[in-house]
Amino acid sequence: SLAEEGDGRYMGFVDVRSFIRKGNSSLWGEARYKNGKKTGRRWNETSDYLLLYPYVMGDTVGGDLKSEQYYFSGGYAYRKGSYTIGAEGSYGADIEYRNADPRPKNLTGDLYFTIGMSWKTGNHYALGYSLHARKYKQTNDLQFYNELGVPNIYHFTGLGTDYYRFRGAKGKSFYKGRSFGGSVNLSPFDAG
């Protein structure tokens, strides 16, 4: 495991899923809640490390983080003859924090949406395409309350380097991103 991701997690969670099919329509949804602790994180005070690497904020102290996560998703599909259309959306939010120095407060939001269509091309295959959109943001605020001094905060840029200009006690970062994409799929299906 990566030191930046920590050495363990203790999480309680609730996960509720539903699927309803009525006639040619299908409807599904999910709601999830997690609460717990991420242990032993070092050189990283930023949430979603694997998504944001190498542009993360870190320090030499690190430690355990309390985490609370929410996730909601849902979708709808409709089949008419050999054609199927559908849409799905999801939103995830996370807060990570620590009550001892260094004290990060990370708030994330991740919105994702997909639409797609497929049609049966013969007796054994379906051809489909889809479009995807994602919007992500994170507010990262790192504070110290120790009056005796604070360690340097590093704004890493990858390959062991950091923004020297921002090194010190400045512990605020804001991440914002968007992505768009698409896919084409050829899938076998049982014609029976």
Model-identified regions with their sequence ranges:
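Outer-envelope beta-barrel architecture signal
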Residues: 23-29, 81-87, 123-127, 189-191
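Residues on the lipid-exposed face of transmembrane beta-strands in outer-membrane beta-barrel proteins
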Residues: 14-20, 72-78, 113-119, 182-188
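Short, flexible helix-coil linker/hinge segments at the edges of structured domains or between repeats
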Residues: 43-56, 130-176
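Long, internal scaffold/assembly segments composed of regular secondary structure
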Residues: 166-192
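Residues that define the transmembrane beta-barrel architecture of outer-membrane proteins
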Residues: 8-14, 66-72, 105-113, 176-182
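Extracellular loop and loop/strand-boundary signature of outer-membrane beta-barrel proteins
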Residues: 2-4, 56-62, 97-103, 167-172
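Transmembrane beta-strands of outer-membrane beta-barrel pores
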Residues: 1, 33-37, 78-80, 91-95, ...
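Outer-membrane beta-barrel translocator domains and adjoining extracellular loop/strand segments
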Residues: 2-6, 40-46, 97-105, 140-146
